[in-house]
Amino acid sequence: MNIVNDKLMAKGVINAIGTVTTLGGNVLSDEVLTSIREVSGKFVDMEQLAEEAGNYIARKVGAESAYITNGASSAIVLSVAACLIRAKPDLRYKLPKLEGGKKYVLTFKNQVNEFKYLISISGAKIKEIGDRNGVSVVNFENTVRKFADKTAAIVYFALDPLPNNLVIEKVVEIAHSFGIPVIVDAAAELPPKDNLRKYLRSGVDVVIFSGGKAIGSFSDTGIMLGTKEIIDIVRGIGPYREEISDSGRRVFLGRVMKVSKEEIVATTVAFDKFLKMDEEAFMLTMYQKCETILKCLGKNNSLSARVINPPWYFPRPVTIPRVEIDFKNGIDADKIVNKLKNNNPPIYCLSDKGKLYLNPQCLKEGEEKIISEAILRLTERELRGE
């Protein structure tokens, strides 16, 4: 009996959406799997392992410090929490229930995403700046000045090419003039690899990446790069820190965000492999996969297809091209997307504004043809009214 297939019903799907959490993030390479087997039979000092892994990653990209977290979302919570107690480290005993002090975290209202509320898990209060159309430099600076004595950090969600977005360099310049640290959530902003260094060059205090997307580690891992000051505070409230006093043993906020030894090692190995990747060849492969889909679809009176660079609000990163399919003759793209999930094997893709989109990033060899044939088959059935 195959437990994965027969008991868990995990027979796998064709992923034409991307490295999204809901489809498992990414697949693990042979090198990563080997590293997991090597460490899984050992006991280790977890705090030491976490520090050594962080130091290794930091050296690779020229960061002061680095830390592997339980996903990028945990990195948001921990980095914000570190900023909340930055001036008063003893407040770590009270997280997330803080009273007084700098509790505000400023964010941008036009940087719309589902992860913003995670900031509040740290105990912070979210204060949005501007509106859905962005904010001017003058208004941003005035708002920062107004709330500076109550603000612990500014969180910036990397969503280029978001229209009317303040550039990160200007955000850092103004924030630092008031002594406020800047945290960037760039979880899915790889490739390009240069983004690992781009935000560090801009002077941000922390930049966060998912370990389970382009980097290729477990889906529930994240990487925090930044200043030694803030990441040292994160270690102090992290999952491996314990204190013993007369009242007993004490753990901290990060205890609920544990990262296993296997995940730490896997993320370090995956990170190293990602840095060595031939990015030009990778991007060429992405475009070739898209062209293969176009070729398999062929000329069809019921649809037209082309390769596009997606808009900012699509699943990240938007550096990866997409195949856009525009159906004709009244065929509903949403309906096709839902029916593809019932294909054998199931195919997961997205629709937006009446069009269907295919992301080549997670497609295995030969899946381009399977997807194309399924779409053509469903299109014919729709025309017949089936």
Label each residue range with its predicted role.
Residues 14-52:
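A glycine-/small-polar-enriched, mobile loop at the entrance of the PLP active site in fold-type I
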